[in-house]
Regions:
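Conserved short histidine dyad/triad with adjacent acidic residue
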Residues: 24-25, 38-55
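Short, conserved beta-strand element in jelly-roll/cupin
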Residues: 43-45, 56-70
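A cytosolic small-molecule/anion-sensing beta-strand core signal
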Residues: 64-65, 80-81, 99
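Ligand-binding loop in jelly-roll beta-barrel domains
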Residues: 89-109
Length: 109
């Protein structure tokens, strides 16, 4: 099983500072990826989105900065800094940057 990557170990860090918002883009930085879990930082410019898709695992998304809109099964949720939501495995979900927005989804397979 692989551990964390793309982040300094045994050091205090700010997760939201580990990924930068870029104009007109969704930027991602994978921190861990294996058969059991996926941990990836995302940064959305205002108005950018990840269209509806499904995941094979439950995903807990935590808003690190800004305001994001999460749609799960046609229900819209708004996340502010510090808020979290669990998107159930197999259910369609999408993410939209209501404002410039950073999130940390942790997917457990």
């Amino acid at each position: 099983m692989n551990g964390f990557k793309n982040v300094e170990k045994a050091a205090v860090l700010s997760l939201r500072e580990q990924v930068a918002i870029q104009e007109g883009q969704v930027v991602s930085r994978t921190l861990a990826q294996n058969d059991a879990v996926s941990v990836t930082l995302f940064a959305f410019d205002k108005g950018e989105e990840i269209s509806s898709h499904r995941s094979g695992g439950d995903a807990m998304v935590t808003c690190l900065e800004g305001v994001g809109r999460i749609t799960v099964d046609d229900t819209v949720y708004t996340l502010h800094e510090g808020d979290s939501i669990v998107m159930p495995a197999g259910h369609p979900h999408a993410v939209f940057g209501e404002e410039r927005f950073k999130m940390l989804p942790v997917v457990v397979f």
